[in-house]
Every structure is written in C-alpha cells, then in structure tokens.
Amino acid sequence: MGKKLLEVKDLHTSFFTANGEVKSVNGVSYYIDEHEIVAVVGESGCGKSVTQMSVMQLVQSPPGKIKSGEVLLEDKNLLEYGPRSKEMQAVRGAQIAMIFQEPMTSLDPVYTVGNQLCEVIRKHRKCTKKEAWQIGVQALADVGIPDPESRMKNYPFEMSGGMRQRAMIATAVACQSKLIICDEPTTALDVTTQAQVMEVLQSLVDKFGTSLLIVTHNLGLVTRYADRIYVMYAGRIVESGTTEEIITKP
C-alpha cells in the first residue's frame, strides 16, 4: 500500500429537526491509502452515506451541519474550506469524485453524455472543446463502453443502467481523480451488471492507481474487492480490519 491519501478524524454531523438533534455521524474516523480499495458497510440509515457527503461538504444546511472533526486530504483539512469555496470546488471532481447510487439522477436527461462529460473535463483540466471530447472518448473506452465515439452523442435515457453508471465512472477517470467515493454504486443494477461495474472499478486501481471507497450494505459484494472494511452502526464505526479479518474473525 502507498502513503495515506485521505484521513477522517472524529467527524460529527447532525441534522436539526422539529423533534431535536439527530446525530447522524457520531465520531467517525477512518483512512484510505493510495492505490487501496476500502469499503464502508452497514445497514440502511447507519450514517455511511452522510459520512461521505460530509467529506465532500455536500450535506444540505439547514437542516444538516458538520459540527466538528477533520477531513485530511494529503494533510490538508478540507473542512477549513467553505462548501462553496473555490478550493472545495477544485477538490470535487479533480481530486475526489463521487459516484451515486442511481446514475439517472446524476446525469441531466436533456444533454448528451458527451456534453456533460466535456463540461466537467474542461472545468478541471483546462483544455479546448476538441481536446475535452477526445479525453471523454478515451475515458468511455477505459471503462469498457463499446463504440465510445457514438456513445458520447447518446442521451442518458438511451443507455442502460449499467452503461449510465460506467459513464459516471468515466467522468472520474477523465478528471484523473485520486479518490473515487462510490455510494452504493451497484444497488440499482442487476447481479450480472453489478459484477461488471465492480470489475471496472477494480481495473481503475490497477491501471491508474486510483483509490476507491465503496459504500454499501452488501458485505458479500465487497469481500472480493476490498483490502479493508469498516463496519458502521448508528453513526459510529463499530468494527474495522482487513477483509479477511472481518469475514473470518468478526
């Protein structure tokens, strides 16, 4: 494993409702090394997704609030930046990318996949439209989409669920993100497509040295791919270790 890429220290995130404070993330700490695949697993509602939204500073405020903690990306505390700051916007996409559960809600249905991909590429890589198009085509090819040139001209509704998810992964590849946070990336897909998407994610680590953080409730899915696993329950990390330790000696 490489050096530490991301470290979260004692993170606290709460939601303030009419019935009082709900501590969704309650003192969570974890780390990810370079070129490593780490999984955060837990039941629905345990706070695993809110933890990653806090890392990206995407928690809606109000009612949510990141109360305390540190999110260190290569020793820089991201929580010192405002959610709308130029520094944080530069981190999102270029250094940390996030792939959500349902790609149809992440892709705009009225723009082609190519237009959306090129917009992100031009923002983070400062290139011409022609260069961005070529980078986008190569990114689609890298994630296993056949005939990427024509697929760039497709609208999201013209692609299958697995193909749309690959297009979202291609966005992270095109931006050369150091870390990809995958929030339930295969839940909305059938079993065969789940395996294909996971193989694509695995290939990113092997080919580009990307680090992956996989958030899921499916322990069986990550046992094949993850180097280490964190188990969350009720807003806390209750167990951590290598995949072998978690599976054989919980």
Language-model-derived ranges and their functions:
Residues K76-N77, E131-S150:
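Conserved ABC ATPase "signature" region
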